[in-house]
Amino acid sequence: GDLTERPTEQRWEETYRGLDSIGQRYPVITVTGNHEYLKYIIRKLERRFSLVFSYYLDSMVGKNQVYTLKYNDMQIFCLDSNREFFYLWTQKKWLEEQLKKSNARWKIVVLHHPLYSIKGSMNNLFQRTMFNPLVEKYGVDLVLQGHEHAYARMTAHGENGEAQAPVYTVSHCSPKNYYIEFDKRFDKFGTGSRYYQQIRVHGDTLTMNAYDATTNDLYDAVDIIKDQTGKSRLEDRGKEIPEALIFHSNGGKKEEAFQKRIDEYKQRKGIR
């Protein structure tokens, strides 16, 4: 989501230039972000988005921009988390239908707003209420999210505390960074930089590697390993990679509070 800063002619031209070399070599799979929407009482998607990414024209479900695609043994479910509650309810029914009939070994859900926010526990409550029970019920392996302009990864745990799917990631590639909360449920954070993920499936293993986009250095890495019964276990290779919490304060109250949260988190994790 948020492929364009604002749905205007100038901003769309910037988006086209940025996508030009990528779109000629790779298929571009998108979800809608809040910046693609026009701000009315009922939000309205700017018309050019569906014309550029024309698969949306074939996948309208109750005026929701949702679709699913399958690639080999992986199925991706793309949601529109920007909508009002009654539209999210329609998406919930669609997602359950799609997950219920899916026979894919690997399932990935993609949406703009994180189901577990790193900006505050009450943020995105409608999205979490609608979609997360389905993520857990139908064995989704990976949830890819954006919007909150930092990096974070949260891993589910079984009854005995063992790490397992689903894995939730929040990421962004914008020069703008947010003052986030360091929720104890998350395994890893990154602030003050940009990030991208590379996901590969090989046999019984799905690998997610996250990179710092400014250096292309590996920043986080997890392997989801699935047995023949569909039960998964997780290998956290990212815990051996140091966390980078970069922040330069100019002395404002919000900045001072964020610096305090960083210091408390570092103390909790034993980060120097």
Question: What are these model-derived regions, one by one?
Answer:
Residues G1-D2, G33-N34, L79, H112, ...:
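Active-site glycine-centered loops adjacent to acidic/histidine catalytic or metal-binding residues
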Residues G1-L3, S102-K119:
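Short acidic, glycine-rich surface-loop motifs adjacent to enzyme active sites
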Residues T4-E5, E36, L115, A150:
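Short active-site segment of divalent metal-dependent hydrolases/proteases
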Residues E9-N103, M122, M130-F131, L142, ...:
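Extended active-site neighborhood of metal-dependent phosphoesterases/phosphodiesterases
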Residues V109-L115, D141-Y151:
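Histidine-centered catalytic micro-motifs
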Residues I118-F126:
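Outer-membrane beta-barrel translocator/channel fold
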Residues N160-N250:
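Binuclear metal-dependent phosphoesterase catalytic core
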Residues I246, K253, A257-R272:
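C-terminal luminal/periplasmic domains and tails of membrane-associated envelope-modifying transferases
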